[in-house]
């Protein structure tokens, strides 16, 4: 929760890897390694998790899924301790996340003989859940002077920051818009007033944090080791209902 001022931090259930991520970032602070290297590390961890799933090595798969979550936090932490924020890193991180999520659900669908549409809508639901969490979280960060490399509305290509190339930012932003645009539009359509409403209380944000990718991967890892892989796709299909429940709660109790 280092992206928020102390007085506005909440318990983020998806951010369990942050303490280890900070240790990794501080260890790498004065080395040649960059946040991009750490992002590549979590991509490798994600593919190792997929390989272990295919080999029915579910404990190992769970380990690599959690390692992926930790490294996913560590790249941002490293950018902060090196004081080198980057749109390149921000969009590469997001593009890598959605591609790995797609491959993970394809793999789970293959292992459980799930039909194509169930697999697709479970993946779609997972992304929609994550988008709602990121939407509320980004609004909170921008309101209280937290990290602003993520914007509430990703409508225009940002200007490259010091140390990065505009062509890289432009390319990755284009990929980001292509992959995430539909989810952003759906969530904004469902709750367009959120940005101008009063601040959501910490307890509500903690509840919504179950939609954070770290918590979602933890659930998948847990279901794999518990022998519940056949329930992963149905779970994320049903869990998408909570998107509408959370939005209804926010509009009812925390609107202006």
Report residues per predicted region.
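C-terminal membrane-associated helical module and adjoining short loops/tails
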Residues: 1-19, 139-256
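Select subsegments of transmembrane alpha-helices in polytopic membrane proteins
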Residues: 35-39, 92-98, 205-214
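Transmembrane helix interruption/hinge and helix-loop junction motifs
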Residues: 52-60, 111-117, 225-234
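Juxtamembrane helix-capping/reentrant segments at transmembrane boundaries
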Residues: 75, 79, 83-97, 151-156
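Alpha-helical transmembrane segments
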Residues: 109-140
